[in-house]
Amino acid sequence: MKTLMPKLFVFAIAGALATETLAEEWNVSVWGKRRAFTEHVHKLGELLDQKTNGEFTLNISYGGLSKNKENLDGISIGAFEMAQFCAGYHADKNRVVTVLELPFLGVENLAQEVAVSAAVYAHPAATEEMAQWNAKLLMTSPMPQYNLVGTGEPRTTLSDFEGMRVRATGGLGKAFAAAGSVPTSVTATEAYQAMESGVVDTVAFAQHAHLSFGTINQADWWTANLNPGTVNCPVVVNIDAYESLSDAHREALDGSVQEALDHYVANYGELLAKWDSVLAEKGVTKVEISADVIDAFRAKAADPIRDAWIADMEAQGLPGQELYDLVTSTLAEAKAAN
């Protein structure tokens, strides 16, 4: 008995240590505050906690780990294991996914946005480019078409866009520039102050961001149907951290992505359903842009910017035409499925 007890004690300690080494906590860098845009990350954390009995958890930090424009850099050096970023913040670092920010692609809903994003994320060119930053594309943060809020008289004609100072990034910024506007790429967290101080006249956001970042509180009007495009914001993971996961934890992570996205889309749908009441509550006029104006905007922005993007990508050795064709074919399939 005297010789057995120490052995049992050693085995117990070894077992405890083995169990402890299985525990995994990932730091996740996002920004702003919890909102529709980050609900899939929170849902992913809940699912991982449930599936692993608390052995794999996410520590989600809003701005405490990095600035939003530096999240991809943080991933590259292993400062944290997971992060969200928007392609327009550093288009030169994530050229492939900027195909999803081209104006007037024709995406009509969040399900279609998920489909085209997944197709591009799975393309070898996207995988290879993100690997340069030690990043693996995990899932998108699908957003509806962007629309403007502004002060003063509504901008309802193409001539009204000339000289308009607008917060718009990526392909959207280029679209407004083609119409004579002056785009600025201040971050989402800076947009309210830029609008309040008069640095910009208008801000292009999806609905959740107008609400979360307060630009709707500055607005006199909102365009209901301009729909020039959207911004693509991936969630990525550090490759080293991903590959170091146990098989069980990696399976739990990969197997939770679709459910997290489904939750995100359903939650965002609830926001869209009550958007008209939000406008009424805040006294914001809903502006419908005429079809002629939208067609004129599309003629100035869509084809020229698309052609320039494809040529630029091909010149850099990236399959620009192939990526654009992938988006259009995937979108056609998604629309046919509905």
Regions found by a protein language model. Give the residues of each.
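N-terminal secretory/targeting leader peptides
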Residues: 24-113, 121, 126-338
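Sec/Tat signal peptide C-region and signal peptidase I cleavage site
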Residues: 17-23
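Hydrophobic alpha-helical targeting segments used for export or membrane insertion
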Residues: 9-13, 17
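Bacterial N-terminal signal peptides that target proteins for export
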Residues: 1-9
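Absolute protein N-terminus
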Residues: 1, 23-24
